A protein has these predicted regions:
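Conserved short S/T/G-enriched processing/targeting/catalytic segments and their helical context
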Residues: 1-102, 106
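Non-catalytic alpha-helical scaffolds and adjoining flexible linkers that form interface surfaces
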Residues: 101-124
Length: 124
């Protein structure tokens, strides 16, 4: 089970998550479930993840790739936190759809993401 918590205070945000991942019996390891994106001076965004590790790693890598390749939609070009959540949700949804087609394989690509942060001028 993964724990990700976000609390909004008058002074800002408090974010915390566990770092244990379980790939089966006796296959427990640690992996950060919190990724910080400070790629532009006017924003600080944090993505916390739970669920299938391959799915969540893909989403984080795709976000980084879109920034590196200066895609039209990336974390630096979106003006609102809600637009950023939609963008990340689209990446996640497309990945889940791609691997959910063959349910007989037993692979469960599900993941849950929690986005927190602030874009200058907007609320946290």
């Amino acid at each position: 089970m993964t724990y990700c918590v976000a609390i909004t205070l008058d002074a800002g945000l408090v974010l915390t998550s566990d770092s244990r991942t379980n790939a089966g019996v006796d296959q427990v390891s640690t992996y950060s479930k919190m990724t910080r994106f400070e790629t532009h001076a006017d924003r600080c965004l944090v993505l916390m993840s739970a669920g299938n590790l391959a799915t969540t790693q893909f989403v984080v890598e795709q976000i980084h790739r879109d920034i590196r390749e200066s895609q039209a939609r990336n974390l630096n070009t979106l003006s609102y936190l809600s637009d950023t959540a939609d963008y990340i949700g689209e990446i996640l949804s497309s990945r889940i759809r791609r691997y959910s087609e063959n349910e007989a394989s037993g692979f469960a690509p599900e993941a849950t993401l929690l986005l927190a942060g602030q874009i200058q001028g907007g609320p946290p």
